[in-house]
Amino acid sequence: MKKFAALLLAGAMAFSMMACGSSSDKKAGDKSSDSKKTESAKSTSASDIKVGVIYIGDENEGYTEAHMKGIQEMKKELGLSDDQIIEKTLIPEDETCYDAAVDLAEQGCNIIFGTSFGHESYLLQAAAEYPDVQFCHATGYQAASSGLDNMHNYFTAVYESRYVSGVVAGLKLNEMIENGDIKEDQTKIGYVGAYPYAEVKSGYTAFFLGVRSVCPSATMKVIYTNSWASIDLEKEAAESLIADGCVLISQHADTTGASTACEKAGVPIVGYNVSMIATAPTQALTSASIDWGPYYTYAVKS
């Protein structure tokens, strides 16, 4: 049981940060690059920093809540004031994102973050028009090929915590077998995915590998909602998986819809982004979570 508790804690806390990748990455020994970075750091004092953030959602869904906590941690670490940070919530993956980015640049932001996969093309457009503003995009991949020195991508190695949370799930399945709750051939897991994108697929692959590392008989079924955050669709997907015989649920989707369904059905849940204990107090095992604070602090300091 102590081992199980330790893995629960590890699953909740494990994360690994990746540096913001520029489209013009320089070698470590490139003195001209180091010089430019030093000059840039000197030219922007803390009082001159103005940060813009474009969120896909708001504080009511876990993914955006995690980013908001990271921004607040950065603000505290760097001693920034409220008027040095401008946050825009509920910005969809369309032209609205470009308009939001332009507005932030016009308000004097010298670094702008966009948090959703579908924001990337609109941030690229804005970055080309505002070369003196740094644009950083979460979960994207086009910065390196864009030819823009002020466009960057960032994400974490969250597959690592997904693997560990999969181990937690596998141990729970073993416990259910030992207790006689299920048989070995009933170790079927359901996974609520947002979109059939590489990010989601790599995540559930890591999770499933973690499960199978301790429970080799486990199988898994995935249902996509085709939405990053829809409490109703995620709840319906979880209910469908449970009805199909899944005895444990996990997710790569941003709301508490799945955990609500699991609590009602008495089915264990491994969440994402934030703790699911509030909505599944008897069924939440752990969540694959990300602490964005260190990255946001690093990026703004840079």
Feature annotation, model-predicted:
Residues 1-11:
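Positively charged n-region of N-terminal signal peptides that target proteins for export
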Residues 16-19:
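C-terminal motif of bacterial Sec signal peptides marking the signal peptidase cleavage site
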Residues 21-24:
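Bacterial signal peptide processing site
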Residues 26-302:
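A residue-level marker of the well-folded mature domains of exported/periplasmic proteins
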